[in-house]
């Protein structure tokens, strides 16, 4: 907060009175911010596209080198083709860079000088001012507008100032995508395991050991799953995938480090006992008369399970999925080891083929809360962001659970009159 003392263009004051400064600011600020948004788009999207094409050409040349050697005709032809394309891309990059410099130079002309509470003057670029309002002259509607605008920024913008300002859109996106992938991974395996234990396995010491192991797995600390995911998924499975399919990128890892896929599988493994237990209970609740009626009509055991048992048990299976989502979406400790980062330069889901990038690191609301609360340079100043992000995480988990509960209710209504 501060008192405006002058608005400068090219280091010349064009307004010195508060009313005049406010009027000129409202005239100039939208234009300046539009140039700032154009600059950010050029720097993040257009420049990123050129860099991806340059990297793809480098990897293509590396693959040809590994396959044919540097003295081969194939390598010479590929090198000539890629060199011509590289020059064209560098020209395109220079044009983008020139436009960015032009926008920076234009925005640098506009500055606002404010006097802080300590009486010291402070100069701000208009492009760096996200919003400005006369705090002591706002009526109820204006205050509501500022409040709603802050929420819009919080939900749709990217973080600024070491995550202590701005929005959490990348963290929302990462949390939702990771939770959905975790659910897609854990539900089929959990249902298959429960079907085998309940419908096919014969009672004995081996099945007893499996049930004990499943129950004990539910009590393992989450950080242990994170260590397992790092060692098995990242360093073993991921490194093997890199050796087989991404040799040209080595020694830089592709799947041999933390990423969205390994984080989802680690949390799927952690929530697997929840789905198994819930599915077993749902299968046990299916009336015996329905099974016997189906078998008496000539159906096989698998046909009975597929047509009678599973549809009737589906609401209970959905309950297990809801519990798994609720637990997995809020976990932080495993994600610190297998993919969550403080700031992700790219989203795991975007418009670039193949659209879903399973190897990328991602931001997560739970890790974002931890980072603000314990890793921020000024934890006290970050407390409002911590509380707001916590509320958002609770609401996000509740929203995903409500959607799953709605699906469960629809399935329950569909099959509630299907008794023999």
What is the meaning of each model-derived region?
Residues 276-287, 301-339:
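Transmembrane alpha-helices
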Residues 148-166, 201, 206, 225-269, ...:
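Membrane-interfacial helix termini and adjacent extracytoplasmic/periplasmic loops
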Residues 1-164, 419-420:
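Membrane-topology segments of multi-pass transport proteins
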């Amino acid at each position: 907060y501060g008192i405006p003392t002058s608005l400068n263009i090219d280091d010349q004051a064009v307004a010195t009175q508060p009313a005049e400064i406010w009027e000129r600011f409202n005239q100039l600020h939208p234009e300046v911010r539009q140039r700032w948004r154009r600059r950010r788009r050029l720097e993040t999207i257009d420049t990123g596209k050129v860099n991806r094409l340059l990297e793809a050409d480098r990897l293509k040349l590396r693959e040809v080198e590994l396959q044919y050697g540097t003295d081969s005709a194939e390598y010479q032809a590929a090198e000539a083709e890629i060199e011509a394309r590289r020059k064209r891309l560098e020209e395109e990059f220079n044009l983008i860079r020139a436009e960015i410099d032009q926008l920076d130079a234009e925005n640098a002309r506009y500055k606002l000088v404010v006097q802080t509470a300590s009486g010291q003057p402070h100069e701000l670029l208009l492009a760096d001012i996200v919003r400005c309002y006369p705090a002591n002259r706002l009526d109820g509607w204006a205050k509501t507008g500022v409040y709603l605008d802050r929420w819009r920024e919080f939900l749709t913008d990217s973080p600024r100032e070491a995550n202590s300002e701005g929005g959490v859109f990348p963290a929302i996106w990462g949390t939702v995508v990771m939770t959905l992938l975790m659910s897609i991974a854990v539900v089929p395996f959990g249902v298959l395991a429960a079907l085998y234990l309940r419908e096919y396995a014969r009672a004995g010491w081996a099945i007893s050991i499996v049930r004990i192991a499943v129950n004990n797995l539910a009590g393992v600390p989450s950080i242990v799953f994170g260590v397992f995911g790092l060692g098995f998924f990242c360093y073993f499975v991921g490194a093997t995938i890199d050796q087989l399919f991404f040799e040209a990128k080595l020694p830089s890892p592709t799947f041999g480090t933390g990423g969205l896929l390994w984080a989802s599988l680690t949390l799927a493994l952690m929530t697997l006992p929840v789905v198994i237990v819930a599915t077993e209970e749902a299968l046990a609740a299916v009336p015996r008369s329905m099974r016997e009626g189906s078998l008496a009509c000539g159906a096989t055991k698998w046909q009975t399970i597929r047509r009678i048992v599973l549809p009737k048990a589906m609401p209970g299976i959905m309950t297990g999925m809801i519990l798994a989502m609720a637990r997995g979406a809020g976990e932080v400790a495993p994600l610190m080891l297998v993919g969550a980062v403080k700031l992700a330069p790219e989203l795991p889901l975007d418009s670039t083929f193949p659209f879903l990038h399973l190897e990328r690191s991602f931001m997560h609301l739970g890790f974002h809360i931890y980072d603000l609360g314990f890793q921020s340079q000024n934890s006290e100043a970050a407390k409002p962001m911590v509380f707001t992000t916590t509320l958002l995480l609770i609401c996000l988990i509740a929203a995903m659970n409500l959607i799953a509960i709605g699906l469960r209710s629809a399935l329950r209504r569909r099959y509630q009159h299907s008794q023999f």
